[in-house]
Amino acid sequence: MIIVISPAKSQNFETATAKYQFTQPIFKDQITKLINTLKHYEVDEIEKLMKISPKLAEEVFTKHNNFDPKSYSELNSKAAIFTFSGDVYKGLEADTLDKKTIEYAQNHLLMLSGLYGLIRPLDLMQAYRLEMGTKIKIDGEILYKYWQDKITAQLNEYFNQQQNKILINLASNEYSQAIDKKSLDAKWLDIDFKENKNGTYKTIGIHAKKARGLMTRYILENRIENISDIKKFNVADYKFNLELSNENLMCFTR
């Protein structure tokens, strides 16, 4: 079983992490090509490309020009699972997971990324900003097309080493589209979280994101290897909702 989640725009490179056997990014050549392309963008071009403020564009410009694709070390990088700090990662709270769970996550959790493609928890990563939906072309292809075959092939390689070939999709639509479902050698299971608002169940972005992190933590801590055990999730008042679920979707409501 493999879980996929989205990355986060917010990243924390300040806090030190415990010592682990850190790993190198999976797609170094592809990352190098992408970052070298991004280095050609001036501040005003970044602002237009990413639809961000001038101040943020300057920060992104600095990040990308400081990026060294030839060297990933603890001097310029940090393990991905401890670096991302958005809503999903607030739910995951990786800093409070024990060492054995982090090591288990290394083989069962992957983060999708516009720059890195796929990131394992202990992969060293440098600061960047590149969403999968950014309208930049590499070799004449948009990011989805650039990454889709590479990401899917790598996932299939991982599934060849897994006993239970199930992909638990806890990523957003923006990122999960970078995987070719039809070519995936595994069952695909979506998980959704909804809130009861005046008798109607609705997906509320900020709550759903944190819940994805909570679910990721639950699966990792409990070493869950089959779908039926996921239904037992009852964190933060969420409960499995049979009526809103089907063979390919598990919905949890509160």
UniProtKB/Swiss-Prot annotation:
Cysteines engaged in disulfide bonds, as pairs: none
Pfam families xref list: H2O2_YaaD (PF03883)
GO biological process terms on file: response to hydroperoxide
Single GO cellular component term: cytosol
Domain of life: Bacteria
Coiled-coil zones: none
Family: Belongs to the UPF0246 family.
Protein name as catalogued: UPF0246 protein Fphi_1075
The organism of origin for this protein: Francisella philomiragia subsp. philomiragia (strain ATCC 25017 / CCUG 19701 / FSC 153 / O#319-036)
